[in-house]
Amino acid sequence: ERKRLLSKCAIITDSDPKDNGDISDRAQKAKDLEKHNLKVCLATHTLEHDLFEQSERNKAIMRDVYRKIHAQTDDLSGDFNVSTLMKKLKSNKDKAEFALQLCDRLETEVAFDVPDYIKDAILFIAPSE
């Protein structure tokens, strides 16, 4: 008889919504895999987009991090919005650098707000008692 690990696992992925608002076929396939020990948590947009829009505090932190990476970019001097950030993060190299710099910054931040789908994934794996 095969024995299986009963460890819980959570997958966090983008929903990649279609034009009609439904989640993508890929996201639906992931959701269809859910079982008692597997939970799929879907991001409304992308991680960066959702983190930025989560709170004004997040916006300030993320703007500051991106400005430090691209100090010479003029259109980042004001309070740029999520669309501007997402356009700037088009290249995977830029996304990776931004993620690393944001991670470093968050080591010293007192607070940073995360979307509910991330909290749900963490609480599924490690429920608070």
Predicted regions and their residues:
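Acidic, divalent-metal-binding catalytic cores of TOPRIM
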Residues: 1-129
